[in-house]
Amino acid sequence: MLRRDILRLGAALAATPFLHSAHAQSAGPRWSTGAAASVARQELYPEVLDGRIYVAGGLLTPNTGVSAHFESYDPATDRWTRLATLPEARHHIALAAAGGLIYGAGGFSGGFPNWRAQASTYVCDPRADRWRDGVPIPYPAAEGVFAAISQRLYLVGGRTRAVEGARHFNEHVDTARAVSFDPATGHWSAIADAPTARNSAAAAVIGGRLYVVGGRQAARQTDGSLRQVNVADLEVYDPKADRWSVLSPMPQAQGGLAAAAHGGCLYVFGGEQWVPEQKVFDSAWVYDPATDRWRALPSLPTPRHGLGAATVGNRIHVIGGGTRVGGDHASVVHEVLVLSDAMT
């Protein structure tokens, strides 16, 4: 008798919309779908400002094409809006927001293989929908990470020109160099170099510190070609101490991945691998700084690399990226990791 009563109660609870919804919210993270981006592209570094997600530049398909597109996504309406284009088409241009403005730093000009890292920066006031030239980075930089902490901007790692006249992908080298920019003074300053020189990493800010994860290193072979080897390293920069610390590495080395922060944790998505075999990852992970531990998340519905991630509310939006290794399969895919109330 008691068993029948319990079964009836369970059926009644499952049939009650409110209670069912509450149960679904507490069940853990799940994937949903957002409106497709207006342009298929990859090598994206999005930023959030005033509840909107901004995406600029990128590689088109085929990868000889470079985008100057700039658009914003409003999660409240699930709509994309085209905005003023970049002054110059760029891919691997990194975005960060401070003082109500969007800053675009460096990136490559030119399609493959004629990539050329740039030192120029651009600044956009979304209210005016207009770009202007910013203060150049002290050195050409692309494929690094860029983020704002307490109204200062931090640019770390990536690739820079091996020689000033570099006009080819193979004429660039990985760097551990790091700099910060003060919008109030318009000056760039050197900060402590990162422990690891790498490109195609991802980063997010948690508790006023910059977490840099994954990516890859380009090793030159005897024939002059580059061998791209993924790294799993996780490092954190404390701007108050100007010091880096090494943390537990990712369970799996992923390059060309995306990262975002939520609830004091670091979330990472996707990426690709060139050696020992070529593959695109659907893997997603979350790292908790309080325990220095990683755990797996539900896999990306669509494996991608060169994608971007951005957090608004209790949702992480994972946008664009290439669906196959290399640069010829850019997408408009927009998938959303919905996090439970317990994780907000």
Where are these predicted regions, by residue range?
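C-terminal segment of classical bacterial N-terminal signal peptides
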Residues: P17-S21
